[in-house]
Amino acid sequence: MFFASSLIFPFYILFVKNIGSSYTQFGFSYGLFGLSGALIYPLLGRLSERFDSRYFLLLNSWGMAVLLLYVPHIGSVVQVYIVQVLLGLFGAMQKHGEKVLIANFTDSGERGKKIGNYHFWTAVFSAAAIMLGGFLADFFTVQMIFYASSILYFLSGLMMMKTG
């Protein structure tokens, strides 16, 4: 999941800025992202008592896979706002699901070390994906990078189903 999101992240920022006509719209769209994520966390907390955290990760993966197919076709600021709200919701599912999963699969004595290793590798793969995305953008269209990320998200969802 981290690889797929990092692959498109720099291009999405440029894409959002180019749709709007002001930095106010740009700031508002990112505010919607943060606010929508914040507002769903209490619900996710209650739902995590009833549902396995992998379901949150699965919803994030497949929701992002579908959403990224739509992103290259965004043509208005209102559409950017809607996408930002959905990105915030899916991002919250991913963050919440991964933290619960990490807590469930680590022992308290080794937890700090394992979480450190987890964050190291996710940061390394995120950085590699950002660099690869820049390289690929020189040879393909930015839209193709969004579609490739969509495929990666979908595949990560399939992998979660197989490991569940």
Curated annotation (Swiss-Prot):
This is Uncharacterized MFS-type transporter YitZ. The chain crosses the membrane at residues 25-45, 63-83, 120-140, 141-161. GO terms for molecular function: transmembrane transporter activity. It is a multi-pass membrane protein. Belongs to the major facilitator superfamily. It comes from Bacillus subtilis (strain 168). Keywords: Cell membrane, Membrane, Transmembrane, Transmembrane helix, Transport. It is found in: Cell membrane. Disulfide bonds: none annotated. PANTHER family: MULTIDRUG RESISTANCE PROTEIN MDTG. GO terms for cellular component: plasma membrane. Its main location: membrane. Gene3D superfamilies: MFS general substrate transporter like domains (1.20.1250.20). The keyword Cell membrane applies. It comes from the Bacteria.
